[in-house]
Amino acid sequence: MELLILQGLQQDIKIFLLSPILCAIFRFLFIYFFAPNKTYKGQEKKWCSCFNYGFWWGMDFNAYVLLFLFLLVTLPSLGLESIYVHGDSIRVILGTLYFLVVYIAFLGKLIFYYHYKDTYNSNLRLGRNADKRNLLDIFFNQNHGGWILLSLPIYTVGIYYFLSWILALGTFAVPTVHLGYIYYVYNALITIATVIVYYWFRYGGTFKHRNKPEWDTVPEVVKRDMFFAKACIDDLIAFELAIRAKPQEILAHSDAETIQILTPLIKVEQDLVGTIWNSMRKKAAGPRIKKPKKIFLIVEESYSQFAFDDIYKDIPIANAGRLIREQSSTISIDNFLAGGLISQPSISSMLNGIYDVNLELNEKAYFWNHQLPTSLGKQISELGYTCSLWYGGSLSWSSLGLFAKGNGFHNIYSGFDITSNDTPHTWLGVYDHLFLEGIQQKLDENNTDNYEFHFIYTTSNHGPYTIPIEKYGFEKEALLKELPDYLHKHTEDIGTYAYCDYYLSQFVRYVQETYEDSLVIVTGDHTRRLPMPCQDKGRVHRLREDISTAFYLSHKDFDKSLLNGVRIGTHMNILPTIMELIAPKEYEYVSLFPSLFEQQAFIVTPYHWLSNSHIGFFKDQRVETLEGTPVYDYNLKDVVALQRAYMEVTGAIVRHQL
């Protein structure tokens, strides 16, 4: 009897070996398309270590190709003639399906990296509540979605015929066994050996589960280049890690665990939630300016500090905003963190006064009907202000209308409510200049002497950058003349940013002129990576440039020394800063963070952190000086403890309040 099991196993191995080869090809393409530094000469060790470690880490999925083909085709073919006859066809179909999934994961990673400059991460799970029409708009208009979809059948057919050709190649001759029991012993031994080999590959060339490849053990030579460190993660592995990173974990902690985790931030002896709230109670030192009749907190979509750095001085991207920031009565902070990496958790954190931690608190019905002691709308209204929220898009986005009402806002306006039915808009919202004109018209119509707080959130500075800005004062030809040649391909991107900055700044000037005593605060909901404003191929985006959002505040009585040289801040400082500017002496308010009038050694969010000398990103364990020099030996122990404590505050409150 021929040992047909060996013949089938050889066919399985052919497809199995193709798996890491295909992943390596996709890894190379990812590096080719996106790596800031593609230099090979002199960096051979980094390249080789990246591909070697990626090979073994990828086996966490690819090893299953060997196991499943062996179990689903080779073993059954020993007893079922129909499977034996059609075995190669079954292998080709199964292999094609797997490689199609690998290809889709690769394309998804390219798109994800294009927008977030990261491989798949926890933002992935927030997509279920995103505006699907906007996602489709971005996919087809910014990411060449039509070509991507066209590539799927072409790739599938190509892989199918390639696998058919591979399996049609000859195999080594297999021995013949004449004794029946020896035949079964050989089959059993080969089966056991195959399973053992599967485990050996799946555990990264070891039989010890704890030695499996993971982020913490990426070779140091690779980790020093953060892009290559991410590139060594196969696409399906990155997708799995993102899906498994469940933010709900903090909701499963016991009170005893919470008390322990909170220790670096809050000492709790009894009454966990009461102690948390009491720790946030603060007394205002007394007003620093006369109580303004109008306060404007403007959150510009993707408004990034990078655009205001000196390196962008000669690029016409934020010229209007620069002029506002240069006013003697305007104070800006150049190192400023949002409460989230993307819009939803950022806005949720700002309004609730506690970090959202990707729990999507804005989508929970409790927050549509209840306020926290830290709620922005509630606390500002208690100072005597009528609070209005203005959003450029639909109020159904992230349940913003319901959430803002629950937060304490008296009036909620959509961009579609304050403009005509035929007003041009993207899938996200009304074009910024028309949205801001609509607000201006409403304010002029209802001009009163009342105390009013206006939270304004725009939408246009967002992909796919299809707004016809040439109709609104930004001629493409004129922009091309001002841009260096190497930035011409980014005209739509830069032009859209300049358009948004210009009309935002026009609105700020309108507020300053119309309401002379107004307090104006401007920030971004998060950052977005801007085109590199120089041709230096060796220069990579610095961490601060990637995650520091823009921030400034303006009032006629301000001078540049008001904040005593504070260099760092976060969205969570905004509410207490308003309180310390206008609240009566000894007025009590509730805030997770102090105001910007206090020097802070560390600012920590669930995602990133700042000190007066360093900036860090938790997911990658990446640390740089504020000037952009990488730091590889920074002791993160205390910072991580603070990160966990701030997240635990949210977990404890949600567990006990909801």
Please place each PLM-identified region on the residue numbering.
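A sequence-level detector of short, solvent-exposed, charge-rich linear segments
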Residues: 44, 70-74, 78, 116, ...
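Glycine-centered secondary-structure boundary/capping sites
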Residues: 80-84, 117-123, 137, 143-145, ...
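The feature marks either
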Residues: 140, 225, 232-237, 241-279, ...
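Solvent-exposed soluble domains appended to multi-pass membrane proteins
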Residues: 267-658
